[in-house]
Amino acid sequence: MSILRSSRLLQILLGIIGVVFTVLLVTPGLVVEYFWLSELDYSSVFWTIRGAQVLLFVLVFLVAGLYFGGNFRVLIGNIPPLWASRWAQEGEAPEVGGEPLTRDRLQRLGYVVAGVLSLLFAAGFSGRWNDLLRFWYAGSYGQADPVYGVDLAFYMLELPFLQSLQSAVVGLAFLGLLALVTGYVIAGQIGIQDGGFEADSGALRHLGANLIFLLLGWAWGFYLDLYELLQEGGGAVYGAGYTDVNVVIPALYVMVAATLVLAGLVGLNLYRRRLRLLGIGGAGYLVLLVGGLVLAPSLVTQLTVLPSELQVERPYLENNIDMTREAYALGDFKERSYPAQPDLPADAVEQNEETIDNVRLWDPRLLIDTYRQLQEIRLYYEFYSVDVDRYMLDGDYRQVMVSPRELTQQLPEDTWDNRHVRFTHGYGSVSNLVAREGSEGSPEFLTQDIPPQSKYESLDVDNPALYYGERTPTYRIVPAGVPGDSLELDYPRSGENKYTRYGGEGGVSVGSFWKQLLFSYYMGDFNILLTDYIQDDSQIQFWNQVEERVRHVAPFLKLDKDPYLVHGDDRHYYIADAYTTSNSFPYSEPIRGQQGYQGTRYIRNSVKVVVDAYNGDVSLYVSNPEDPIIQTYQRIFPDLFQPLDAMPELLQNHIRYPQDFFEIQMERYRRYHQTQPQVFYNNEDLWTRPQEQYANQQRKMEPYYILTDLPGKDDAGLEFMLMLPMTPDGRDNMIGWVAARSDPPNYGEVVVYELPKDRLIRGPNQIESRIDQDTEISQQLSLWDQRGSSVIRGNLIVVPIEESFLYVEPIYLIADEIQIPEMQRVIAATDQDVAMKRTLRQSLNSVLGEQVVETRDQALAQMQQAAQTAQAASPEQVEGLERAKELIQEARDALQGGDFATFGDRFDELQQVLNDVPLPDTTGTVPPPTSSDTTGTMTAPTGDVSEVTGGS
């Protein structure tokens, strides 16, 4: 008895230790999370999410506990006394711990096992809190699937939870059945005896009841498979095709009924032995399963579908096209034609000054190295990324590149107080115009140095301290030290560094002993408890990276990989794009190969997140209120979201179309722009992203932000957009280009410009080839490469301009000794010409000048012919020739001065003069005038060639 009592005490002690361990493991994290969310005024998020988890945990634990506990109780009850069972050895019951294994002890053991299994089930299923909330608060999409007529919101918001619940039911039943079979076999109630199968009737009834439970779960699974079938890939159609709709769907309905019938037969055998009937039912069930879901679909596919696949699959291809376009918002794209003239007009530069001034020459992949070398200033600062944005600079709309100066991940002197008390924040940012360079090929900085010096008032920030950022390291304690102490390094300066004391509201109060103890345990750093730096007003700042903050505030959103810094009036802000997604959407082709979005079938950029870089405040603004998923989350978290109009206007001016979302859309659009089933089936017009050459390697061109005047719109003026040229799959010529608009009121509009298909329009890779084939350019690049420097060709930018294209590629040199990229040349190209000069303007003048010379030569040949006929001219024709000579002289002066706009104007006027006074040819007939083409390339008959060329 003393041994038994000691065993019970040990069990109680182990139970207490387990509870304490669980509390210590789980509770600190929950308390810390609650404090953190409360500091941001989002405590309701904590209670909603954790409440849903607790509810799921408790419900699943109770259901699983009742199921396992009840089954184990029946199992033990069906086992005869152990000393009389087949376990007994020489009439003695087995012992455990020196005590007989009685029925009561076995019952308690069964309850322990049931409790452990229930805990595992409950812990796993509680992670489905998001599915539960979406299911509970689901609304309507307003559009039905094309097969069952069920609202699409069912697939996106309800089906995932139902599938999880069905899987849990089947898993519970299967595990319970497996445990019962094992228990009965060990107890000798089921087994092979004397060459035959023997089973206790009570054991069979118990197992039969659990088998019914399993079959009911299977029947439910077959029913849910009806909806899952609309999302499965295979064959020509992604989703349910001809075979699925006409064979598999009826077979699934049959399997639902057959499974229920089989469950009924098992139930009948609980009370009346009808093993023969049960055997026939089981065999028939297998025949239906294999025949209906394997053999019949295969035969129909081989005999009916494959011989005329396009014909029979046409309506389902249409479903696939329509639903995928809906899932990725491709149906909202506006499609227009773009003439893509082969030549730029002579006055292209003068007519598009603002666009030319905003062509991005600085490649972010190289500019980051320049920033690091020239502007990190101290070893404890680092630049991690460069973002492209736009600002109004003294009334001019300019494209700007910006990078925050953040704390490095590894301090030079990595002591505890340096890491957590003294080096607490980054400082300011660096920015430059995208198309300007300063001395020696470096950027022309708009904001630079420490403290930041800005050339424009719109870039000035009163408080440039960055306590929160993209890569902000570890936690820190602010303010530290006694009131009045300034322990934090604000920024370095000559002589003596500038120190400061944090005066913001970011962070969780850590002044009390209990909170210091809590955070010491949670952070695994007991210096928090021991340090003298912490005072009553001290706060601990943690989860300081933008991605971390958004993930803890809204873990149900996917975050874009590129948050970007914005200059505010008083401080810096980060803007991040967040997405609502679903892995369930009928007939939608899922995302493959894009990290973080694998398996996604529906996506919307529904949220813009703003993070205060000084206080750490997180604000979420709904940018797509029509999205049914964000509508659901607004019902779940009524205090979390704000309308986009509530965002400060200064920040609204900096929202942009996100690159991740655009790339996902373009990966789908490259195929799903083919809306005709036959074209889609044959991939007759498949597009792809073009290749470009970067750092001597071929790679896929990335979308890029550009500031230009979008063709075909009603109002003229620059606007900020994300652009990507497209080429036919397997070819390098350009077939179209896509622009995603970012400026209000047109934010979110995507325009696709399709190019003529009856002639060649050079794509980026073909322009790269033309550059390689240019002897002068190739020789110069090779020469630089041989002089101890590396030549890197930056990203090629395609600029739509004057119904044509301008191609621009910067050339950088990187010395082997000092890794500072310097922009040495800029290549400009059109469809016809290419030039490399020191600046973009010089390259443009060279390219356009070659076109003008060609135009001039054509015109001068006709001028020479006209001069030869002057003797036979009438007085009116003589007067016209005199005026023509004056215009020729003015055109020559303009050409020599590089004034192509005036040159074009004079040729236009010359054309008009010659049209009004036609000149006789040498045979006495009047030749028809030659008109200017739509590119602005002028040809007209004129006088003496030397009048224009100056005799050269």
UniProtKB/Swiss-Prot annotation:
Which is a Pfam family this sequence falls into? UPF0182
Q: Where is the composition biased (Polar residues)?
A: 931-940
Transmembrane helix as a keyword of this entry, yes or no, is: yes
Sorted alphabetically, the Gene Ontology cellular component annotations on this record are: extracellular region; plasma membrane
The reply to whether Transmembrane figures as a keyword in the UniProt entry is yes
* Annotated segments matching region Disordered: 917-952
Residue ranges spanning the membrane: these are 12-32, 52-72, 109-129, 168-188, 207-227, 247-267, 277-297
Keywords from the named record: Cell membrane, Membrane, Transmembrane, Transmembrane helix
- Which InterPro entries does the UniProt record give? UPF0182
Report the domain of life of the source organism.
Bacteria
UniProt subcellular location: Cell membrane
Q: How does it sit in the membrane?
A: Multi-pass membrane protein
Family statement drawn from the similarity comment of this UniProt entry:
Belongs to the UPF0182 family.
Name recorded for this polypeptide: UPF0182 protein SRU_2225
